[in-house]
UniProtKB/Swiss-Prot annotation:
The lineage of its organism: Bacteria, Pseudomonadati, Pseudomonadota, Gammaproteobacteria, Enterobacterales. ATP binds at G38, A39, S40, G41, A42, G43, K44, S45. Signal peptide: none annotated. One of its GO terms (molecular function) is ABC-type D-methionine transporter activity. It is found in: Cell inner membrane. It comes from Salmonella typhi. Residues 2-241 form the ABC transporter domain. The gene is metN1. The complex is composed of two ATP-binding proteins (MetN), two transmembrane proteins (MetI) and a solute-binding protein (MetQ). The keyword Acyltransferase does not apply. Belongs to the ABC transporter superfamily. Methionine importer (TC 3.A.1.24) family. This is Methionine import ATP-binding protein MetN 1. Its EC number is 7.4.2.11.
Amino acid sequence: MIKLSNITKVFQQGARTIQALNNVSLHVPAGQIYGVIGASGAGKSTLIRCVNLLERPTEGSVMVGGQELTTLSESGLTKARRQIGMIFQHFNLLSSRTVFGNVALPLELDNTPKEEIKRRVTELLDLVGLGDKHDSYPANLSGGQKQRVAIARALASNPKVLLCDEATSALDPATTRSILELLKDINRRLGLTILLITHEMDVVKRICDCVAVISNGELIEQDTVSEVFSHPKTPLAQKFIQSTLHLDIPEDYQARLKASPETDSVPMLRMEFTGQSVDAPLLSETARRFNVNNNIISAQMDYAGGVKFGIMLTEMHGTQEETQAAIAWLQDHHVKVEVLGYV
């Protein structure tokens, strides 16, 4: 549905040249929810704006629905853009128009008959859960409701693709979850292809089928969400994954934590489990094999792309030789183990 090939984007600021994207290629199959994650300034907003040519690439090809957009005339591009909806971090609603009027606007600009506008807008407001807000004004809506209006407006022309530019960044966590569930529901019901960009791995984890990691204008990793979470190939992907599971060391342990082992001290370990290592009874196996005892301090588990992954803080009791052997064995069985210190 979306195919970007060898996209390069260069901005000129006076005598200064800024390369925002460098030879980026990305394929989003029809009906998928595809996430692009990166830090601020990585180039993700430029990338998504190249899809509908809000930013025209310096080099490369943009195919949407089998159509090459970069070669279209202005009128042809306008027609093609009707098949590409877009929502933003800021909702960009017209304050002087009601909810109904905001959603109706693209249909009015397309000279759609009034009866058809009424039918379509009513249908869309029901779809996004705002069937009772026809006559409300944006000033009287919450942030989540405003984004729902923006989603309905983006769907007004019945597009095949929806682009989401940091669509949940301005929302609180509970509202973010509800908007993501709405996008997932729309994808399921309408078969809509969704390309979203974000700096939050939680967003990717909740709804995406595939994910690409962007850094300094280049895609450094891309795969299914389950594969990236199970076997991240780059340090940046690992960092984003760690941000979704975070365990703080309890204060009483922090007060006792030492950088080097002392008499009768034991190592405090941070363990990350992904893929098959989540379900395997690895800790009990280390107890049997190496005569160590694991005291679990805290743990957390979650799902991404249908795959479980988890994190755990433990004390490992045993001799130095036993604990070292147990740690090496865990690492051989795809558990990432970090010694945080000694308590």
